[in-house]
């Protein structure tokens, strides 16, 4: 099975950002023979603070994602937070993602699966890898085209996450594709005064450790200038560092 790569900014900030990232991902795909899937959120519905930037919203966001596909020929992934969003999102993207906090929401998982698109279900920060059989079964019974499971760490006290890499082989017993979210797993939730902190310097180590445990997909949030990012600034990877990391994982 070919290794899957997913990369893009945390949130849709501007058309210019999407264009810059799309151009670089397309170039990496040509150079390395990969098929990196472009990801970005049209709405960050679970930001820490009411004043945090959320994105352009569904209608405008989907149009901006469509423009990325048209210009750069990239497959697309975005996440949904409410069941009614599944149908319009399914008309635009190749992969519908279920956020970790929402992976037990039956109606949400079923709505995504009924589009027939690939569904990427992120493991909640409070679940074990073995627990992911239940969201997987919901998506399978509802007719998902393909189902991926994603590891993104577990809560460790307050404002911290740790990764139990044993979850990866446990989830591989359930689904053939297990993705490592290498950037959200280095978050420090709510630890930066009304926003999430993080430690991006650990992203490459997370990726290689996950590969050693059998992960066959890798998820990276990237930005040309992460510290200026409007969401998850502390844990996004520099766009210029992505190609070297992807190459090292092939």
Predicted stretch roles:
Residues 10-23, 122-133, 152-170, 186-204:
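Active-site glycine- and acidic-residue-rich loops that bind
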Residues 40-99, 104-108:
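N-terminal active-site wall of soluble small-molecule enzyme domains
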Residues 23-32, 53-77, 112-118, 168-178, ...:
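Alpha-helix-loop-beta-strand connector modules within alpha/beta enzyme cores
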Residues 43-48, 102-170, 174:
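Conserved anion-binding
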Residues 18-22, 85-86, 91-101, 106-115, ...:
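A short alpha/beta connector and helix-capping loop motif
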Residues 50-59, 97-102, 158-165, 185-211, ...:
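Active-site-adjacent loop and "lid" segments of alpha/beta metabolic enzymes
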Residues 5-17, 36-58, 222-232:
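Glycine-rich, proline-tolerant flexible connector loops at the mouths of alpha/beta enzymes
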Residues 5-8, 36-40, 76-78, 96-98, ...:
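Hydrophobic faces of well-ordered beta-strands that scaffold small-molecule active sites
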């Amino acid at each position: 099975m070919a290794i899957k790569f997913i990369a893009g900014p945390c949130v849709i900030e501007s058309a210019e950002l999407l264009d810059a990232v799309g151009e670089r991902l397309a170039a990496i795909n040509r150079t390395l023979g990969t098929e990196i899937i472009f990801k970005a959120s049209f709405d960050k519905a679970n930001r820490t603070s009411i004043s945090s930037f959320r994105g352009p919203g569904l209608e405008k966001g989907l149009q901006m994602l469509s423009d990325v596909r048209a210009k750069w020929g990239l497959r697309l992934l975005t996440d949904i937070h409410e069941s009614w969003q599944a149908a319009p999102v399914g008309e635009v993207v190749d992969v519908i993602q279920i956020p970790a906090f929402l992976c037990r929401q039956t109606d949400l998982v079923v709505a995504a699966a009924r589009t027939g698109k690939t569904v990427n279900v992120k493991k909640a920060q409070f679940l074990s890898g073995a627990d992911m059989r239940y969201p997987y079964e919901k998506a399978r019974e509802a007719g998902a085209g393909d189902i991926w499971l994603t590891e993104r760490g577990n809560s460790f006290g307050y404002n911290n996450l740790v990764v139990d890499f044993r979850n990866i082989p446990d989830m591989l017993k359930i689904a053939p594709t297990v993705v490592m979210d290498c950037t959200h797993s280095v978050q420090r939730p709510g630890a930066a005064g009304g926003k999430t902190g993080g430690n991006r310097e650990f992203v490459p180590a997370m990726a290689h450790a996950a590969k050693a445990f059998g992960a066959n997909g890798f998820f990276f949030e990237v930005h040309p200038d992460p510290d200026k990012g409007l969401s998850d600034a502390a844990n996004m990877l520099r766009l210029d560092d992505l190609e070297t990391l992807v190459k090292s994982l092939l």
